[in-house]
């Protein structure tokens, strides 16, 4: 059976990812592994010696002991929080009839823990921002690009609001990771029966290479049973794609994480985070 690895932090973005996972799991005939990672920095319990150095050598023993006790309590609270978040995830999947759910709690750093479980996963899911999204990029958000860069599996980056997936937009530039995404798209049962749009953005509307890439994607999509709407549009990839998503009411964007044309700027460097954070729909990326 296929496995979906869902990274959660209990935030509103993570809640949305549960709904997308519940939609995808039966279409992929997949189980769901829900991973919560407690930041190791919040679990380190200080000794009285360490604390005396930080608050002054003359601090009373009673005060130091109280501070150590508080550190222990904090570690317990963090553990309890993880337990509650994972149990909430299980309860949600129970209500959706998803029975094959595995809860995983690790202490460390998300990027490091993620590698341990990625090998058995077929698809990675995480929210595009984390628990501190109201104030700054949160835990998941801060790790998002590192995970996308490091993952050997397709990554579904979910938006805050769940939107039923009805229309797909595949942004294709012919790059190697785009070809992997094309192969995943045509082979996966997840997207069968959905409306598919294929978009290639070029510097010129009559660019022969861009036309060839679009023809390739269209032919493979048709062979897989899709009836794709094809578009070749001249312009800036980020602006063109964002406008197309809005205009056509697209519910899922698919693209390679690396390309060999200007489309690569969508997912390399600072523009990646900006696009993913500003997107109101989920984005499926393939390295």
Language model features: what each stretch is:
Residues 1-2, 287:
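Absolute protein N-terminus
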Residues 2-68, 150, 163-231:
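Small/aliphatic-rich secondary-structure junction motif
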Residues 13-20, 26-27, 103-161, 244-287:
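Gly/Ser-rich helix-loop-strand patches that form or flank binding pockets
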Residues 34, 102-105, 157, 198, ...:
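A structural preference for short, hydrophobic beta-strand core positions in alpha/beta folds
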Residues 41-45, 50, 72-124, 223-266, ...:
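Structural beta-alpha unit
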Residues 58-63, 83-86, 115-117, 153-155, ...:
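Short hydrophobic/aromatic-rich motifs at helix boundaries and adjacent loops
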């Amino acid at each position: 059976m296929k496995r979906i690895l869902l990274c959660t932090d209990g935030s509103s973005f993570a809640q949305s990812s549960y709904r997308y996972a519940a939609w995808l799991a039966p279409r992929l005939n997949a189980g769901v592994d829900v991973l919560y990672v407690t930041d190791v920095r919040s679990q380190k319990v200080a000794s009285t010696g360490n604390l005396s150095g930080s608050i002054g050598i003359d601090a009373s023993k009673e005060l130091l002991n109280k501070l150590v006790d508080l550190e222990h309590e904090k570690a317990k609270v963090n553990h309890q929080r993880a337990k509650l978040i994972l149990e909430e995830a299980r309860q949600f999947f129970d209500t959706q009839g998803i029975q094959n759910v595995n809860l995983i709690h690790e202490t460390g750093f998300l990027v490091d823990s993620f590698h341990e479980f990625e090998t058995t996963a077929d698809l990675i899911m995480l929210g595009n921002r984390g628990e501190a999204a109201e104030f700054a990029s949160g835990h998941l958000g801060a790790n998002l690009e590192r995970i996308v860069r490091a993952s050997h599996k397709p990554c579904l980056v979910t938006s805050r609001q769940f939107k039923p997936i009805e229309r797909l937009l595949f942004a294709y530039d012919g790059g190697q990771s785009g070809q992997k995404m094309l192969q995943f798209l045509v082979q996966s049962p997840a997207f069968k029966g959905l409306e598919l749009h294929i978009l290639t953005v070029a510097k010129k509307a009559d660019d022969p290479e861009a036309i060839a890439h679009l023809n390739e994607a269209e032919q493979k999509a048709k062979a897989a049973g899709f009836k794709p709407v094809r578009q070749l549009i001249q312009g800036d990839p980020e602006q063109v794609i964002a406008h197309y998503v809005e205009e056509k009411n697209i519910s899922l964007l698919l693209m390679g994480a690396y390309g060999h044309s200007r489309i690569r700027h969508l997912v390399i460097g600072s523009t990646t985070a900006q696009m993913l954070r500003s997107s109101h729909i989920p984005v499926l990326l393939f390295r």
